[in-house]
Amino acid sequence: MKRSFLLPIAIGLTLSLPALAAPAKKAQAACPSQKFSTFFAAFSDSVPLQKAFTDYPLTTVMLDHAVEPEPRKISKQLPMSKLSFPLIPPKAVRTKQGLAFRVDQETDNNAKVSLFKVDTGYQVAYFFRKESCWKLERREDWSM
């Protein structure tokens, strides 16, 4: 009787071992588009896409306004854990806050988008690079 009881447990353990040996891989997000305008429209409105298609650590450039007599440029490499998402406000927020964006540069493999507010010192530039898909590689905040 003991033997018949132990056999199913042993078989169950044997069958479970391959699942334990290889950890499950995270599902890779599908590239929204190879065309930058379509990619950016999806990327700018989706935190999961922003997380999936950003290079880490993200190069972040900003102005230190506490320095006298002029602000100085600071460059940091920020891991995902130090970033606040969304990196680009979604369309509804941009509209509510009067923010606009323009594509300043676009080639087959690089693009630069500026997010700004007219008649204010708000200006943030986003730099993208395309490999198998577009990825955000740098953010520069020149806001005054």
Language-model features: where?
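Bacterial N-terminal signal peptides
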Residues: P8-S16
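Surface-exposed, charged secondary-structure patches
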Residues: L63-D119
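Bacterial N-terminal signal peptides that target proteins for export
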Residues: M1-I9
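Short, low-complexity N-terminal intrinsically disordered segments enriched in polar/charged residues
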Residues: A22-D45
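Short, well-ordered alpha-helical segments enriched in acidic and aromatic residues
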Residues: F39-A42, L49-V67, I74
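Charged, low-complexity intrinsically disordered segments
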Residues: F40, S44-P48, E137-S143
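Short beta-strand edge/turn micro-motifs at domain boundaries
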Residues: G121-M144
